[in-house]
Regions:
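Start-transfer (signal-anchor) and selected internal transmembrane alpha helices
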Residues: 1-21
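Transmembrane-helix signature of polytopic, membrane-embedded enzymes
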Residues: 86-116, 130, 149
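Juxtamembrane segments of multi-pass membrane glycosylation machinery
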Residues: 45-47, 51, 63-77, 97-98
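Membrane-interface alpha helices of multi-pass inner-membrane proteins
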Residues: 151-169, 173
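Extracytoplasmic catalytic/substrate-binding loops of multi-pass membrane glycan-assembly enzymes
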Residues: 24-39, 49-64
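Membrane-interface transmembrane helices that cradle and orient dolichyl/undecaprenyl
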Residues: 132-155
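Loop-to-helix entry region of an early transmembrane alpha helix in multi-pass inner-membrane enzymes
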Residues: 55, 59, 69-87
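Multi-pass, polyprenyl lipid-linked donor-dependent membrane glycosyltransferases
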Residues: 77-84, 116-135, 139, 165, ...
Length: 174
């Protein structure tokens, strides 16, 4: 079935507004979000990751924090990550289930969980999800059609990118 781009864009925008922008505007950010914003600022002040301050996320995540300087511009990357996650999750789900209703319910459940779990923090995991779901999509495409074996290198590259964004969740769920 065709990818419901409009539905994915609407859910992505709602989740981004509720979990990434609203906490900043209302001043109810979590400790994780405050620490991530601080890291973006500290890197610009000459701080070193893992030496001058504690960090448990991946190097690419901290590079992104350095680029956006811990600002609200980060919400644009968060939005893109949720958009990619929704698209690749939909593609992976339709590869193993031909029931459109259940696939759409899975998509709604994903966005509700992503919004609830990342309210004010946990952004590195959300940024890693498109790469994890892309790898899942490629692996499921191979399982459905074993003649389609072009993608193992892409699976490895996507898992590596996910690992450099959020090492612990990637190691646990890949």
């Amino acid at each position: 079935s065709p990818i419901p781009f409009l539905r994915i864009i609407i859910w992505t925008t709602l989740v981004t507004l509720l979990s990434a922008i609203t906490p900043v505007l209302l001043g109810v950010t979590s400790l994780q979000h405050s620490a991530d914003s601080y890291i973006g600022w500290a890197l610009h002040q000459g701080g070193d990751i893992y030496t001058n301050f504690f960090g448990s996320e991946g190097l690419l995540y901290y590079l992104l924090q350095f680029i956006v300087k811990g600002s609200i511009v980060f919400a644009a990357f968060y939005w893109l990550a949720l958009l990619g996650s929704g698209i690749f999750l939909f593609r992976a789900a339709t590869a193993i289930s031909k029931r459109d209703k259940q696939v759409h319910q899975l998509l709604i459940g994903f966005y509700l969980l992503a919004g609830g779990l990342s309210f004010g923090g946990g952004y590195a995991t959300i940024l890693a999800l498109p790469f994890l779901f892309y790898g899942l999509d490629l692996a499921l495409a191979y399982m459905v059609d074993s003649n389609n074996d072009k993608g193992f290198l892409r699976i490895g590259m996507s898992m590596a990118l996910a690992f450099f964004l959020a090492p612990l969740p990637t190691a646990l769920y890949s």
